[in-house]
A protein has these predicted regions:
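Short S/T/G/P-rich N-terminal loop/turn motif that feeds into the first structured element of a domain
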Residues: 1-45, 51-63, 67-68, 77-94
Length: 94
């Protein structure tokens, strides 16, 4: 599933520093893949798109990494009506 995240950024420096870890797919838990990061020019807000096995898995990873650097809102993307989503990430062989 695709999950969108709306970030209201409280501490831009901390958000970017902590967010570097989020952008590295090898740091994410299994089944959680970062797909897009779109910050505002003034770094007061950002949106992200993730792939994940569940919304809760994405939320737990992001909230535990960013801490108080941002307030985050999550929702599952309706892929039937969405436009411009990235192709699904390849699944790792077991």
């Amino acid at each position: 599933m695709y999950v969108a995240v709306l970030h209201r950024i409280n501490d831009p420096e901390a958000m970017l520093s902590r967010g570097d870890r989020l952008g590295d797919p090898s740091s994410a838990p299994p089944g959680v893949v970062p797909r897009q990061f779109c910050p505002s020019k003034d770094l007061s807000a950002a949106t992200c798109v993730w792939e994940g096995d569940s919304l809760d898995a994405v939320r737990e990873y992001i909230d535990s990494t960013l801490g108080d650097a941002s307030e985050n809102t999550y929702f599952e993307i309706d892929t039937e009506h969405a436009q411009g989503l990235p192709e699904p990430a390849p699944m790792e062989a077991s």
